[in-house]
A protein has these predicted regions:
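ATP-binding/phosphotransfer module of carbohydrate and carboxylate kinases, centering on a glycine-rich
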Residues: 3-6, 11-154
């Protein structure tokens, strides 16, 4: 990603700066500063913090700015997934994390970008789905890993 954004790790070019909840948050705040209309405008003008949950709620209420920010993140994520599909040819890609609660608002741009940027012979068999675990996937995975180590399964 060549967006010039500095990641929280201190480097530039990280996928997280363009394809994450924090990226959607940054895009929305930038557009609100430019004066774009949104359901979030009043909250922004009052100086209240806008959270990712606020953005996702606004998207579910058909807020154009929130939807565009999520679509931008989805497109960037789809481009990255396309590269991984070209290399690994997975049968299934599961989208998790808090942004996954955007459902079709993020899934459609991901699928479009994957179709555009991956080899059609390879991506034909790959399914892309939203995790049923949502934002809890990482926590559940960490618990399962700890459990497996504790029980000596790993």
């Amino acid at each position: 990603m060549n967006n010039g954004q500095i990641c929280h790790c201190g480097k530039t070019g990280c996928l997280e700066t363009a394809a994450s909840g924090s990226a959607a948050h940054r895009v929305v705040l930038e557009k609100l500063k430019e004066g774009h209309a949104s359901l979030l405008s009043e909250k922004f003008k009052s100086g209240s913090d806008i959270t990712l949950e606020d953005i996702l709620d606004a998207a579910h209420e058909e807020d154009v700015l929130a939807i565009e920010a999520i679509e931008e993140v989805g497109t960037n994520l789809g481009r990255a997934i396309a590269g991984l599909i070209n290399i690994f040819n997975p049968e299934l890609v599961i989208i998790g994390g808090c942004v996954s609660s955007a459902q079709d608002y993020i899934l459609l741009p991901i699928k479009i970008a994957v179709q555009k940027h991956s080899l059609s012979l390879i991506n034909r068999d790959t399914k892309i789905k939203i995790s049923k675990l949502g934002g809890k996937a990482g926590s559940i995975g960490a618990c399962m890993l700890s459990r497996s180590k504790l029980l000596g399964l790993l």
